[in-house]
């Protein structure tokens, strides 16, 4: 008889421009069984972003109503916009034994860690601060003032690396994805995640 295991919660975050979204997209393409949680936000869509696929784009009024209804696992205000993780999708999939990936900001990740200390928390770092600035500028979606604001915030966010279980440098997307896949495999083999399994095997041998 197989033992049903709780799904693994994988939280991926890092400063703006570190490449979290690109990494998560490539990870999901390689690991078809992973469930990517879609965040809600009040910011405007960037070029090519689709509502319900990249984000659930909400008005500030809609977002605040969701807060009142306790619909979020976590939420935070970042760069003058609200971001949040809808609760129902995450909890349902974890309970069903599915592994769930959250791509969220650092504020949100730390809130999730308080509720799910057993989760796997991965911090994505750029290869250098110069490269980070170039990536933010290349997006072409922010004014010079916003770029400076994001860059300063990113520098401060590096102080939170020690709150995470793992750090992955995104100097190459494929290499970063392979490191995250290795982390997931290792986490699934941890003794404290397999107690029921080895106890069952031990009982069968008695």
UniProtKB/Swiss-Prot annotation:
Entry binding sites for ATP: 14-21
For this UniProt entry, which segments traverse the membrane? none
EC main group? transferase
Q: What is its EC number?
A: 2.7.4.8
Output the superkingdom of the source species.
Bacteria
- Where does it localize? Cytoplasm
Is Secreted given among the entry's keywords? Answer: no
- Give the CC-aspect GO terms: cytosol
GO MF annotations, alphabetized: ATP binding; guanylate kinase activity
Q: Where is the Guanylate kinase-like domain?
A: 7-185
Cite the InterPro entries for this sequence. GK/Ca_channel_bsu (IPR008145), Guanylate_kin-like_dom (IPR008144), Guanylate_kinase (IPR017665), Guanylate_kinase_CS (IPR020590), P-loop_NTPase (IPR027417)
Q: Which family does it belong to?
A: Belongs to the guanylate kinase family.
HAMAP family registered for this protein in UniProt: Guanylate_kinase (MF_00328)
According to its UniProt entry, the function of this protein is described as: Essential for recycling GMP and indirectly, cGMP.
> Per its record, how is this protein called by name?
Guanylate kinase
Q: Which organism is it from?
A: Caldanaerobacter subterraneus subsp. tengcongensis (strain DSM 15242 / JCM 11007 / NBRC 100824 / MB4)
């Amino acid at each position: 008889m197989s033992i049903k295991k709780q799904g693994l919660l994988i939280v991926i975050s890092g400063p703006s421009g570190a490449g979290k979204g690109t990494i998560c997209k490539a990870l999901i393409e390689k690991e078809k069984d992973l469930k990517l949680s879609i965040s809600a936000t009040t910011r405007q869509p960037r070029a090519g972003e689709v509502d319900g696929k990249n984000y659930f784009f909400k008005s500030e009024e809609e977002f605040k109503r969701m807060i009142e209804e306790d619909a979020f696992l976590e939420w935070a205000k970042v760069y003058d916009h609200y971001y949040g993780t809808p609760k129902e999708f995450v909890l349902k999939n974890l309970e069903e034994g599915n592994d769930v990936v959250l791509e969220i900001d650092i504020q949100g990740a730390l809130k999730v860690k308080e509720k799910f200390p057993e989760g796997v928390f991965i911090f994505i770092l750029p290869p250098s601060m110069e490269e980070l600035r170039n990536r933010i500028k290349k997006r072409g979606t922010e004014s010079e003032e916003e770029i400076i604001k994001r860059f300063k915030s990113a520098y401060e966010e590096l102080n939170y690396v020690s709150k995470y279980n793992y750090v992955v440098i995104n100097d190459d997307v494929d290499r970063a994805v392979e490191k995250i896949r290795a982390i997931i495999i290792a986490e699934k083999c941890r003794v404290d995640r397999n107690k029921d399994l080895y106890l069952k095997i031990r009982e069968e041998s008695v």
